[in-house]
Structures are given as structure tokens and as C-alpha cells.
Regions:
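Glycan-binding loop/region signatures in secreted carbohydrate-active enzymes
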Residues: 160, 165-233
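Chitinase-like catalytic core of GlcNAc-active glycosidases
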Residues: 1-141
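A structural signal for short, well-ordered beta-strand segments and their strand-loop junctions
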Residues: 89-91, 117-122, 160-166, 246-248
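Short acidic, glycine/proline-enriched helix-loop-strand junctions
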Residues: 98-101, 107-116, 201-210, 254-263
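A structural signal for the main folded, soluble domain(s) of proteins
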Residues: 33-36, 41, 63, 70-74, ...
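A generic secondary-structure signal
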Residues: 75-82, 109, 150-154, 232-240
Length: 263
């Protein structure tokens, strides 16, 4: 399993010190189906470990319609060749849109020919002939292992799946009938842990830590990931043959030393 850190341009130098490839979240779709990018400087990595090829992450957030899919695909592939990227990640909003699906199908064909990794959100999986589907690992109910096995079966096995290892930090007010919780920042979670000093438990079903507390007559269930739980999710992914895993650098920068066991 290959590991990647999804980074903004300003984070590349710090993140490049860790034993993971870099997925560069520096690209978006502009007017006229153009490829726009932020200033990007990819530093050479020092040390004994050879770096993995980087990946291009393309966002469609607030982007116009892709009316020239071939031109955009050509621009993306040129950028990959210029920077020696080993693959492409489509960070597209859901639900899927037809213009995005046409573009994904065309780009997927080109990536298959050049043997580049091509990662798609689940709603776009049917747009490409040989997609590698991004599966989010942050679940708050049921069994994590069962969920992952079902996703792998849906997409033809681990070789066709990459993990989006989102760091879970959620506050559920009980009873949580909707299954939806309130996202917590790390600062808010740290403040709760310091204030409440709760007994923290590990959920074998969810592969996550949890604790409970009461406030203003309401019961709260806090579910969160740390470096250990993320490593356990990685371990299961490796056992099941998952192709790669992505961490969002802003989510894990505070635990990166522990996560990667940096010495």
C-alpha cells in the first residue's frame, strides 16, 4: 500500500519530510475548461528514502461547466508530464454531473494507456473503464471492517480502491437518531479532553476512540481518531490489498511524527 499526504503548496516543504508521496491540491478548473494552478514548488527530499512520484489533485469546487473536456484532459496530462506526476486524483463534488463524467471518462482512458493512477469519487466510478475509487474511512456506525469489505466487493477488490483516511472527530448528542454528529476541530476536542478528563475507550467495531459526557442535561458521545486508530485502519487496508491511502495534511500534521513513527 502506498501512502500519500494531500498538501497545499505552502505545506509541501514540511510534509515532504515524511515517508509518503505528495498529492498536490493545487489545481482547479477555470473558465473555458482551462487548468488553473497555484504557485507550486516541489522540494527535493533528502535522506535515504526515494520519494514516490507525486499526484495531481484536481478540484471542481465552484468551477464552471467543462465544455471542452479534451482540452482540459490534455492540459492535465501535460502538467503531469512536466512535473513527473504518477497519477491524478479528481476531487469532485457529489452528486456527479454529466460534464464532469464525460471529462472523467476521457481522462481515464488516457491514464489507462499511460498506466497512471486515476482516482475517482464513488459517484464517478462508472465514468471510467478501470477506475480506482476513493473510499472514505470515517464511519460512525456499524462495523468498519464489514463496511470496507463491502466497498471492496462493490469495486472489484482492493487493487481498485484507495482509502481517504479522514480523521474522525465528531460530537453526537444522544440519542443520535439521524446518525449525524457535529464535527469538532482538534482544538475543541483537546479542550473537551482537558476539561472532562474522561475515560477513553477503543471501539473494535468502528476502529476509533470514544468517550461520553453530560452537559446541560444532554448526553454526548464523542468519536475520534488518533494516530493509533488511523494505523489500525491502514493495517486492515494492507491486509485486504487496498492500493493506496491518502491523509489530508492539515488533519494529521499534529500527529504526523507518531503516525509515521518518525525518529
Amino acid at each position: 500500500m502506498q501512502l500519500y499526504l494531500t498538501v497545499r503548496p505552502e505545506d509541501t516543504r514540511t510534509a515532504s519530510a515524511y515517508p509518503a508521496g505528495l498529492a498536490h491540491a493545487a489545481y482547479r478548473i477555470g473558465e473555458g475548461s482551462s487548468l488553473l494552478s497555484r504557485n507550486l514548488l516541489t522540494p527535493a527530499r533528502s535522506g535515504p528514502m526515494a520519494p514516490l512520484p507525486g499526484l495531481l489533485v484536481l478540484s471542481d469546487r465552484s468551477a464552471p461547466s467543462i465544455d471542452r473536456p479534451a482540452a482540459l484532459a490534455e492540459a492535465v496530462l501535460r502538467e503531469c508530464a512536466r512535473r513527473s506526476y504518477g497519477g491524478i486524483v479528481l476531487d469532485f463534488d457529489e452528486p456527479s454531473r454529466e460534464d464532469r463524467r464525460r471529462f472523467a471518462a476521457l481522462l481515464g482512458q488516457q491514464c489507462a494507456k499511460s498506466r497512471k493512477l486515476f482516482c475517482l469519487p464513488p459517484s464517478y466510478a462508472g465514468a471510467a473503464e478501470h477506475p480506482t475509487v476513493i473510499v472514505n474511512t470515517a464511519i460512525s456506525g456499524g462495523s468498519f471492517e464489514t463496511h470496507i469489505r463491502e466497498e471492496l466487493a462493490r469495486y472489484g477488490g482492493g487493487r481498485n480502491v484507495v482509502f481517504d483516511l479522514q480523521r474522525l472527530r465528531m460530537d453526537f448528542r444522544l440519542p443520535a437518531r439521524s446518525g449525524q454528529g457535529e464535527p469538532l476541530t482538534q482544538a475543541a476536542l483537546d479542550a473537551l479532553l482537558k476539561e472532562r478528563q474522561p475515560a477513553v475507550f477503543f471501539s473494535k467495531d468502528l476502529f476509533a476512540c470514544y468517550f461520553t459526557y453530560a452537559k446541560n442535561g444532554e448526553s454526548h458521545f464523542i468519536l475520534f481518531d488518533d494516530a493509533d486508530t488511523l494505523r489500525q485502519k491502514l493495517r486492515l487496508g494492507r491486509q485486504l490489498g487496498v492500493a493506496a491511502a491518502f491523509f489530508q495534511w492539515p488533519e494529521v500534521c499534529d500527529i504526523a511524527d507518531s503516525l509515521f513513527r518518525r525518529k
